[in-house]
């Protein structure tokens, strides 16, 4: 028991607000009913054609990203909690209203508006986590955020599916209520963390987090390391996007009629491992720099996805999934840490709003690239390309790690 408790040591002694955000995030993610079922709702419940639904879903995602960008600026300008309360509550009200409206056009418009205003509050949790932590505590705190996401998404879709089929009104009300509960937890128990002028002055002693004046673009230009990092992470997400695209095609190609069942089971393996292993991996890597962890994650992507070039058995697919899942945990928990450690104290909200766009970009390019490549070769050859990209990304990340190490040593001397 003592050995097991040692794995939880990194999570002890964190600020109370971090634990509140952890529970608030679980509640919010468990109640994320509408998003995952939006396509199904618009197609089968409202009766919109698939072509139009595709356009609506794309616009909905775009509005959410625009809202996130604007929200990042407001978070830095007026404060974290104000943005969360005003725009988070507005989004929740929108979802709640859909429970009592029958007009499909009005429902569609409300859902799109809710996605837009809800996007404003998306960077809040990450920004507060950055404000309240530094060093090893920051690794543990972002690891908790990642666990909350996985716990929520392990339970949420099951509950959402049940409500969608049997109690549609509560499908919308449940999303709204869990949104309100999560916001209430943060509003009551978490203080405003927007840096004061004194804290901004103190930040000048931290070369990588010192205050900056001007726009997000100006701050990025002054930090070329973050620009390079953003490019590398796009490569990582191009690779990672194949867990839904390339993997589903290969499993269907090999297992035919059982393909959907086997693909679903591999997704379950991924979800369970993400929920269970995060604590142990965070503890094992607590003394390793975020950049190096991400580089190791890239190697595991190369191995886990690359081995699909030659495997055929279900059990080998489980091993493959387990391998790239460990890589996913390393990349996901340390990417936020790296961004936080290199973000000026004055621009934390804006920098936290950029990451979802980087992720979306990778997930947009990945399937398109893979589809084109497979069209002219075959599905197995895709994994050679994916493994090569993962290796390139990993090597670039390791180079970034060495550059950062030299910079830190120069500052300390």
Language-model region placement:
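Juxtamembrane intracellular "pre-TM" segments in multi-pass secondary transporters
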Residues: 1-15, 193-229, 413
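Structural signature of the two symmetry-related core transmembrane helices
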Residues: 82-96, 292-306
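Helix-loop junctions on the cytosolic side of multi-pass membrane transporters
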Residues: 186-201, 399-411
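Residue-level signature of mid-helix packing/kink "hotspots" within the transmembrane helices
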Residues: 33, 61-69, 153-154, 271-279, ...
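A membrane-interface helix-boundary motif in multi-pass transporters
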Residues: 164-177, 372-390
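Helix-to-loop junctions at the C-terminal end of transmembrane segments
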Residues: 67-79, 277-289
């Amino acid at each position: 028991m003592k050995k097991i408790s040692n794995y939880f040591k990194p999570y002890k002694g964190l600020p109370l607000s971090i634990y509140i955000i952890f529970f608030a995030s679980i509640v919010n993610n468990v109640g994320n009913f509408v998003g995952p079922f939006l396509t199904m709702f618009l197609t089968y419940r409202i009766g919109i054609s698939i072509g139009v639904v595709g356009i609506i879903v794309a616009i909905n995602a775009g509005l959410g990203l625009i809202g996130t960008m604007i929200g990042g600026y407001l978070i830095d300008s007026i404060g974290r909690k104000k943005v969360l309360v005003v725009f988070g509550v507005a989004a929740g009200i929108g979802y709640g209203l859909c429970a009592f409206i029958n007009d499909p056009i009005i429902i569609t418009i409300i859902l799109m508006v809710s996605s837009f205003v809800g996007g404003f509050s998306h960077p809040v949790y990450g920004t507060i986590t950055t404000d309240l932590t530094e060093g090893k505590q920051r690794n543990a705190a972002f690891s908790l955020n990642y666990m909350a996401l996985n716990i929520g998404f392990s339970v949420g879709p099951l509950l959402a599916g049940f409500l969608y089929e049997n109690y549609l009104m509560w499908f919308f009300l449940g999303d709204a209520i869990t949104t309100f509960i999560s916001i209430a937890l943060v509003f009551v128990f978490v203080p405003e963390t927007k840096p004061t002028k004194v804290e901004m002055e103190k930040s000048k002693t931290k070369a990588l987090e010192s205050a900056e004046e001007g726009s997000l673009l100006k701050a990025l230009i002054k930090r070329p390391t973050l620009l390079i990092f953003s490019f590398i992470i796009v490569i990582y997400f191009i690779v990672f996007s194949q867990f839904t695209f390339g993997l589903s095609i290969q499993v269907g190609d090999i297992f035919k009629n059982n393909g959907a069942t086997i693909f679903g089971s591999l997704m379950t393996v991924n979800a369970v491992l993400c929920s269970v292993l995060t604590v142990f991996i965070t503890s094992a890597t607590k003394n390793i720099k975020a950049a190096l962890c991400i580089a190791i994650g890239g190697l595991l992507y190369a191995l886990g996805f690359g081995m699909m070039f030659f495997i055929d058995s279900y059990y080998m697919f489980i091993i493959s999934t387990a391998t790239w899942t460990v890589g996913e945990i390393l990349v996901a928990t340390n990417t936020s840490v790296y961004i936080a450690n290199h973000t000026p104290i004055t621009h934390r909200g804006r920098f936290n709003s950029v990451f979802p766009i980087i992720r979306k970009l990778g997930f947009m390019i990945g399937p398109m690239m893979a589809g084109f490549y497979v069209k002219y070769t075959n599905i197995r050859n895709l994994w050679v390309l994916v493994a090569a990209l993962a290796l390139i990304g990993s090597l670039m990340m390791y180079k970034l790690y060495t550059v950062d190490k030299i910079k830190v040593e120069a500052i300390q001397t």
